[in-house]
Amino acid sequence: METKYGIIFYKETSNIGDDIQTYASKQFLPHIDYIIERENLDTFVSKNKEKVKVIMNGWYFHHAENWPPTPFIDPKLISMHFTDNIKIQGWSASYPNVFDNFGKKFFEDNEPVGCRDVHTQKLMDSLNIKNYFSSCLTTTLSLPGKAEKEDVIYVVDVSDEVVEYIKSHTHSKVEKLTHYLTHEDQNKSFDERMKCVEELLTKYRNAKMVVTRRLHAALPCLALNTPVLLIKYDDPNYKGRLDTFYDFVNNVSESDLLNETISVDFDK
């Protein structure tokens, strides 16, 4: 029987970063037989009830009641991010299937878990689940063709103050981009969404520089050899998800940039 492959897709997302992660897994698949909704993993059934191989990178438990995935999914657990807010907020009593009972058994049956960040590793360690640091799959991204570099700095979902600061400190064109998806974007087909991702990544590849708050703008830039500056969030809720990558990507807080506590040469 021919091996069947599925891909994780989050149709209702408002962040194209989720689509970028899907695009990253797509490059490793010989073909796609099933598009599997990330938040409905517990209801997926393959056509002939065969096992479907799925790369399960991404951020899970937005709808914790839908965990674990069905037995029709043969998972490759890599580049996964989990938050323990479910336990912190006392939800584990309502959703015991996440980190206990058959939820934990899913991890045990499919370990080791490739963790996107150290925070997730520590969570897996606390559950005695075998794991390793895999980083994010978006650091493996590649695009067809060659880069055609342009004298443009893309600023992605940063504050107006940061945009104006950069404009006053460079001779290059500064252009704003966003990772927010509109309802119109959400209604596009899978293939259309992947085309939008490729167009965005091509812009990043061709840029002189990218300045962003978005992890899935910064990490693809590393893969595409584009200089990138990550503006750090002051919100501690982002710490576990982002701080693992501060050793890999140039980063600065907004206040340090605007106050010039740390100097950045945008014309280098």
Give the label of every model feature segment.
Residues 1-268:
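Active-site anion-handling motifs in enzyme catalytic cores
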